[in-house]
Amino acid sequence: MSGSQTRLELRIDVLDKKDQGALALPTLTVPQFVDAILNEFSEIEYLGNVASDYQLEKASDGTPLDDSTPIGQQVGNGASLVLVERERPLPELTMRPSQDVYLREQATGKVFKLCWQPAIVGRLAESQPYNELVAVDLKPYGTALRVSRRHLQITEDGGQFFIENLSKNPALLLRNQDKPAEITATPLPLQPGDVVELDRADIALKFIVRNGAPAAAPSDEPAAA
């Protein structure tokens, strides 16, 4: 994209993709700029599309930028920034996973970070127990009524992730070209790249483990916002 001279020239670490060039209008708010970053780098599998899930920090000292103040009033030309994920508070009786793990809904590209484990995949429902453990809320989907409120649970033991079915509603685990495995009440190991299929709801979720990719070559073609 091309940019005018009125834009700020910035360098941004987009999660594991380091030192990327960006051009931004100084009048943009942080959420507007983050939204543009998410669109520009949508090829990153574990990068979501909801600006409020992220914040921008100054690379020099980790100071977060203020969401309500235009970026031109907070940083100058040539500034280095870091895009980071906002952590959600831990529910009681849960732990942080040992790695950054995600489920990516294959049709829309929506990314759900599993901020705790055990993590429930299903639908938020205040009337049901363990509502605070729902890390993947599929309620907004048009086929959500075919998803159980407490459908699946993902846990970790010794660095290995497992998935089990908490409901009578079927789910399948797809791995490469292997025959699909039914997910039952007996935990199955989860591997990076596995796809969890909720067949009745026509929803497929890819399991992604963020290992920390090697530093990407700096981009000399700045994205404009």
Each language-model region and where it sits:
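Conserved positions in beta-strands of structured domains
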Residues: 122, 153-155
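Residue-level recognition of conserved beta-strand positions in structured domain cores
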Residues: 123, 165-166, 175, 200, ...
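Residues that act as N-cap/strand-start positions at coil-to-secondary-structure junctions
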Residues: 17, 106, 146-148, 182, ...
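C-terminal regulatory/effector modules of DNA-binding transcriptional regulators
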Residues: 179-203, 208-224
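Intrinsically disordered, low-complexity acidic Ser/Thr-rich regulatory segments
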Residues: 1-21, 25-26, 31, 35-143, ...
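Forkhead-associated
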Residues: 53-67, 151-152, 159-194
